[in-house]
Every structure is written in structure tokens, then in C-alpha cells.
Regions:
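Small/polar-rich, solvent-exposed N-terminal microdomains that initiate assembly or binding
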Residues: 1-65
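Hydrophobic beta-strand residues in large extracellular and virion-surface proteins
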Residues: 10, 14, 27, 51-53, ...
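Acidic-leaning, charged glycine-interspersed low-complexity segments
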Residues: 20-22, 47-49, 91-145
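Short, solvent-exposed secondary-structure capping/transition elements
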Residues: 61-63, 85-89
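"Short basic amphipathic alpha-helical interaction patches in structured regions
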Residues: 66-70, 89-96
Length: 145
């Protein structure tokens, strides 16, 4: 699997999670939308939460095999909350979205590790990021089967 393929697969799976859909969250693979574009999209849709799947680190686990390299991977899912969402009473927050993502993805093959939350007070934006670990066979994106 390629890095892009992993991001797209995770984004597609999360876009089917009922709780995220119900609360108007839209999940994007990092290669499809920058974080700033995701935030702009969230703000434009009357205070929704944008969710961006990123893969900041891959580390080779073993020597190559015929299909690629066994690789340990960090997978992060950033849930970006627009200021309008924060002001809604009993609204679904970035932290709620990150917890939902943690429960949706945690499995035998994807290990949930942590949730971190940060706030940009100047812009009023809150980001909660769920981090996971997994191992995949990293394939060459220029070689299509």
C-alpha cells in the first residue's frame, strides 16, 4: 500500500462513521486538502468539524520483501473545530470527533495511542488529534499493479 492509498482508505472509512456524518464532519486525506483548506471548508459550512488524515512518519521495520518494505507507521487524524462550532451549546467538539475516530479505527491492525488537543486562541480554532500506530507493506507509488 502507498502512503496516499493508506490516507485515502482511512478517510473513506471515517466518512462512513455514523456519528461523524451525523454531526457534519467531513474527512479528507492529507493529499486531497491542506489543513488550512480543511479549516476554511469547516468555517464555510457554518461551523462544522474538518477531519484530516495525515501520516507524518514511516519507519522501515525489516528488509524489503517482494512487494515492498514492511514499515511501522504513525497515523494521525486531526479534527479541526471552527470557532462557530465551539459556541454551539452542547455542540459536537473536536475532542468528541477525535474520541469517535479513536473508537472507530482502533482494531487488531491499527493501535490507538493517544489524543492531543491544542488551541489557537488568536483564531479560536481547536484541534484534537488522535494518533495510531500500524504496520503496512509500503509499496512504490510509481509501480502500479
Amino acid at each position: 500500500m502507498t502512503i496516499r492509498g493508506l490516507q485515502q482508505k482511512v478517510a473513506a472509512a471515517l466518512n462512513k462513521v455514523e456519528a461523524l456524518v451525523q454531526h457534519g464532519c467531513k474527512v479528507f486525506a492529507e493529499d486531497m486538502l491542506t489543513v488550512q483548506d480543511a479549516l476554511n471548508s469547516a468555517v464555510a459550512t457554518a461551523g462544522k468539524i474538518a477531519v484530516v488524515v495525515v501520516t507524518p512518519r514511516f519507519e522501515r521495520d525489516a528488509s524489503g520483501c517482494t512487494d515492498g518494505f514492511p514499515s511501522g507507521c504513525e497515523l494521525r487524524v486531526a479534527c479541526i473545530e471552527a470557532p462557530a462550532q465551539r459556541s454551539k451549546r452542547n455542540g459536537f467538539t473536536a475532542l468528541d470527533a477525535a474520541e469517535t475516530v479513536a473508537h472507530a479505527l482502533d482494531s487488531d491492525s491499527i493501535e490507538w495511542r493517544s489524543i492531543d488537543q491544542t488551541a489557537d486562541e488568536r483564531r479560536g480554532v481547536v484541534t484534537a488529534t488522535a494518533e495510531f500506530g500500524l504496520t503496512i507493506i509500503l509499496t512504490n507509488p510509481t509501480e502500479r499493479n
